[in-house]
A protein has these predicted regions:
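An acidic, low-aromatic, low-complexity terminal/linker signal
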Residues: 1-152
């Protein structure tokens, strides 16, 4: 009996971020770095969700605009954005977000499946949600976000 209770009380740790006023979380173990505003070089003929590339300590990193990836309106011109760096298949990717907030531990027992009201695009890139003080934290699946075969 105790074992089942302790499993329900396990905590998941997330880096919380905001994309177009939506609170999101990505598992902290998948995050390599958090970056402030970076110079991004546009890549000709790249899909629209590829913002370009940036230099991270001498390593070229593909920058993915999460607003475009999630089919949201573009960020206001001149708005400073942050990057959450994740690794997939040995390559580094920077997910451009509006803001990175905090690292948060949440009980696994509070995790819920995606609600039916979540748009098709959001549901395709999320694993579920947490309800926090009247806000919905959408847990993003970084692997799916980085799979460009699912683009558009």
């Amino acid at each position: 009996m105790e074992r089942a209770d302790s499993a329900a009380d396990e905590e998941q740790v997330f880096v919380t971020l905001t994309v177009a006023d939506q609170l999101c979380g990505v598992p902290v173990l998948g995050v390599r770095d958090i970056l402030g505003e970076q110079a991004i070089t546009r890549i000709p003929l790249a899909p629209p969700e590829i913002a370009g590339s940036l230099n991270l300590r001498g390593r070229i990193v593909t920058a993915i605009d999460l607003r475009r990836r999630l089919q949201l309106p573009a960020a206001p011109s001149g708005e400073k954005r942050m990057s959450v760096v994740a690794e997939q298949g040995g390559e580094l990717y920077a997910l451009l977000v509006d803001q990175v907030s905090e690292v948060m531990s949440l009980k696994s027992s509070a995790f819920e499946q995606n609600p039916p009201t979540l748009t098709k695009t959001w549901a395709a890139f999320s694993t579920g949600v947490y309800r926090l003080d009247g806000r919905l934290l959408v847990v993003l699946d970084v692997g799916k976000l980085l799979n460009m075969a699912d683009a558009g």
